C-alpha cells in the first residue's frame, strides 16, 4: 500500500520562511513513512493571484531553476516522490502555473502546466498564467503513474477522464482555493460539499 502525504499550510510573504516550514513538514511526512508527498498550489508564496500586480511576476522562475533545484535535492535526500507547484517563467511574457514531479533520486519525472485558468474575483490567474500546452499525460514515477492536474482543472471532468484513459493510477490536484474568513457559513459549507 502506498503511503501518501498532502501538505496544505498557511503561508506568508516571506518565501524563505514558507520554504523552511515546508521542509520541516515534508521531512516529517517522510520520517512517518510517506513515499509520495503532494504540496499545495503555488506553495512558495502567498496566493498572489488575488490582485493584478506586475510586481508579482518577480516571483516566477525558470524550471529548472532555484526552487526546482531545492526540491530536487530534498526529494533525493528524503527518498520520496514529491509533487510541487511553481510559478514558471518559461520565456519573456510566457508564464505558467506548473506542477513539477520529482522522483526519489531527485530527477524531474515530469511537469504539467495548468490548462484551465480562472478569472473570478480573488482569482485573477489569467493576468499571470498562460494555459498549459502539454496535454493530459500521466507522469511515470517509482510509485505509479500520476495524473497530475492543478486546482481549477478539477472543474473539468474531461481532464481526469483523459488522464485515466492514458493509464493514470492516481489523480493529484495541488490546490490553493478555499473559502475566505468573510464568506458566510453557508458558503463555506457549500464549498466543502463540492470537493
Where are these regions (language model features)?
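Active-site beta-strand/loop signature of hydrolases that rely on acidic residues for catalysis
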Residues: 4, 26-55, 75, 82-83, ...
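Short, glycine/charged-enriched secondary-structure capping and boundary segments
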Residues: 20-21, 51-54, 97-98, 162-164, ...
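Active-site beta-loop-alpha junctions enriched in small/polar residues
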Residues: 9, 42, 87-89, 114-117, ...
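Catalytic-core segment of enzymes that process non-peptidic bonds
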Residues: 58-148
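Generic structural signal for helix capping and beta-alpha/helix-loop junctions
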Residues: 14, 46, 92, 116-119, ...
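CN hydrolase (nitrilase-like) catalytic-core segments centered on the catalytic cysteine
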Residues: 60-83, 145, 151-195
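Short, acidic/polar
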Residues: 17-28, 156-161
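Short beta-strand segments enriched in small/hydrophobic residues
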Residues: 1-10
